[in-house]
């Protein structure tokens, strides 16, 4: 079968041009989605009376054969056929003959590829969604395991205040919950059928787009054919969702990399998820975490790639849009793999029971104690700042300071001041919902199961 557009041309396409313009090397990932669309379009052609029942049956049998070949990895993808659409159509012609030429009636590759891409994104959002759900569940399980363990919380990578390990882990669960919600929002906009828009002006045949939408499980159809074939907003939104996931994975990986060092010694990583050094026998390197962190930049770059591609395109379709798929496929596979790895890490990570919280983490508690003694917070802050300087100069932890020493800075300190200078007291003194107080953390753990109902909205 000659090229679909060869009638206009007197010369064969240069082999160099074929190699430069082909997309089958990567858009073969859309093969099954393209076939789904072919089956739906075939139904619309029959209903509109554009093809006969005999042609319909012939085409349908050929498409089923192609589907089997693809599923068995027996389909030959030919660069000379340009893209996935023409590869399938050419193979259909080989199988059934002239009827194959009728399938493309009433559509363009412009609306065809847009629909394929939406089908791909919907499918992969569901896959990513399930992995996010599994990751959140692992974080909750790990939080339950360490719901009594205290660690230092950080600002500016400086020890700040004591927090429960469970509270720390649940902070990431909240971030991934937002990622799940963003995916739901993106899914709703992706869930629009653009098939039937043609090259840009629509189809000349009375094709039932609502029938096609129903068959392909789209909740709505596009309203403007020009916008439909030009639109890649939905892909950008999807890519931002992936970038946000990558960011949260990277931040968590960064923490674990730091916490795993000899300088911190907060966590232990399983041998099965680490690698060694070719020269230093003692090394146990967190390579998986480092790659999760590194791959975040790759996902960001794919988002920027797509946005830069789109920024200067005139309406409507331009061949530049062929370049949307590789960044999307790469970012998708990167996120799928990174999520799988992080799930394994959370499942097997171990927090050490003897985490050293540090000597100065209770300074804020001392300041708040003075506030309870009717000293304005700014004044209390200054007083405790002087106490901290004294403790550092004399190499004393705050817990060891006597009432007499504290009274040198403020007579408001009573004997009960010693009761609050402990990590456990600091945790218990937190009174706001969402704080690291054990009761509130336990409520957050219990709420997590009900929040999974959000995950069923797709």
UniProtKB/Swiss-Prot annotation:
Pathway: Amino-acid biosynthesis; L-arginine biosynthesis; L-arginine from L-ornithine and carbamoyl phosphate: step 3/3. Keywords: Amino-acid biosynthesis, Arginine biosynthesis, Cytoplasm, Lyase. The keyword DNA damage does not apply. One of its GO terms (cellular component) is cytosol. It catalyses: 2-(N(omega)-L-arginino)succinate = fumarate + L-arginine. InterPro entries: Arg_succ_lyase_C, Argininosuccinate_lyase, Fumarase/histidase_N, Fumarate_lyase_CS, Fumarate_lyase_fam, Fumarate_lyase_N, L-Aspartase-like. GO terms for biological process: arginine biosynthetic process via ornithine; L-arginine biosynthetic process. SUPFAM superfamilies: L-aspartase-like (SSF48557). It is found in: Cytoplasm. It comes from the Bacteria. This is Argininosuccinate lyase. The gene is argH. It comes from Hydrogenobaculum sp. (strain Y04AAS1). HAMAP family: Arg_succ_lyase. It is an enzyme of class 4 (lyase). Signal peptide: none annotated. Belongs to the lyase 1 family. Argininosuccinate lyase subfamily.
